[in-house]
Amino acid sequence: ERTRLTIGACMRYEDDTAHIELAEYRDTRRDGTMWAVNLLAKAWDNASAVVIDEQSPATSLLPELNNAGIQVTVTRSTDMGRACGRLQDMLRDGTLTHLPEDGQHQLWHAVRKATIRPIGKSGMFGWNRPDDDTDISPLVACTLALHGAMTSQRDPTRQQEAWY
């Protein structure tokens, strides 16, 4: 329904543990969408990835993100299946942390309400909305942020040289 735009964030540590949180959750009817492009452009130099699911309405921002110099990873359903599995595994194994509920109401609501849907026949799954009124975008955004942090080869701290 395109009424919310959500940005999740993930910090990956050297020991392959990670921390996720809901970074932004805004009403697009009030704030529009360009705020997200501007925010991501400011953060890009320190980011390892910006990830958008191919079925997300946020794909409409791809031209603006590309014009801002941001390399966007667009995921497919199998990427989502791997990402959801990784989030579940890391939570179970105690290698993924998150903020408490009081600072992340929308994320916690999405976690409580989301159901799962199968992806393919090999046991992969994705998050699903139980009804049209439930917004699970905070959970999806944090899941994709984790996926980007754990799979990206981009190192924003690496010095780079240009040869002409």
Residues covered by each model-derived region:
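RNase H-like, metal-dependent nuclease domains and their acidic two-metal-ion catalytic environment used
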Residues: 1-77, 81, 85, 98-164
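Short, surface-exposed amphipathic charged segments that create phosphate/polyanion-binding patches used
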Residues: 85-94
